[in-house]
Amino acid sequence: MDFLHSEIGSAKDNFYSPVHNWYKFTAGFSYKFVEAILEGEKNSQNIVFEPFAGCGTTLVSSQKCGVKAIGNEGQEFMLDIIKAKLYWNIDKTECINSLNYIDSYIKEHLTNFSMEEVHPLLSTLYDNETLKVLYLTRDSLDHISNDKIRLFLKLALSQTMHKVGLYPIAVPYISRTKRMANSGHAFARFQSIVLQMLEDIGPLQNIEQTSEIYLHDSRFENPNIGDSICNYCITSPPYLNNLDYGEVSKVHTHFFGLTENWNDITQKVRKNLVTGATTHYRDIDFDINIFKENDFSKENQLVFDELFTSYIQIMEIAKTRNGKKSFNILMMHYFEDMYYVLSSTYKCNFLGADNKQ
């Protein structure tokens, strides 16, 4: 497999590849990595498993290669993004008709739209006229009966939000250090994105949908996936880098009504993710004496012993620093969670199957 190049471990390649670039996320990996692994696998009986589907790089690449793939994703919002990226047989005429309907809906309801409906966070990121159009576009999607087209348009709307803000709505962070030069014009930007997406799937419409995605926490076995049915696991797991994947999507989850506040993010998003940030838990709930008696610690005694040594060292170092981050606790939770992910992943893969991570 000749796929190694300087950007293979980043998402830069994906920014220039149709479908992959529909939803951009900086913490990713190149689609070329997946395609190189699956080269020559088209029409084979092999199945790829992706425990951290994210923005769908593995699933989209597998489908482009004609290889069956199954993925788990813990965030409801990202689940819809991935589904939309896998629907390539979209009727262009019906989609254009839906665009025209949305335009009419906005014009009909614009005057009577109440700014009280707007989430406080979003009111700081967009001007009022843009917010009205964004929210009315969102509301109009409830009247689109075709599920695939509705998700297709929802994805386009999520990307419109990046284009029309007062500030760069970057993932993973919101930057307020500079203002966007060309903010606003929400419907025109939305329409342009939809038309580009339709153009992108033109050459792909005869490709069978071979990838499927489940809303599921990969720390636990997915009952929809049988034992030993997958041949490959191709993924980029969450890193121990204190990046809060629940927090980074808050603009979208607040906008689409999935979350309202910090507690919602914890209860509805963070609880379904591998512990990768100190915001995922309360320090007061952690007891190292209880932790050392759990299944992870008992079944991995040598690993636990090494972690415990680091736990003490990090705790001592923290006393000399100004920050209050409990990285020692974060480390323990992370390794415990990843142990359960690896266990469930191993169970659905053939014994001795390739695991490219």
Feature roles, as predicted:
Residues M1-N43:
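S-adenosyl-L-methionine
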Residues S44, L258-W262, N349-D354:
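Short glycine-dipeptide loop
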Residues F152-A156, V164, T266-G323:
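Extended, charge-rich helix/loop segments that form flexible
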Residues R321-M332:
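Surface-exposed cleft-lining segments at the edges of enzyme active sites
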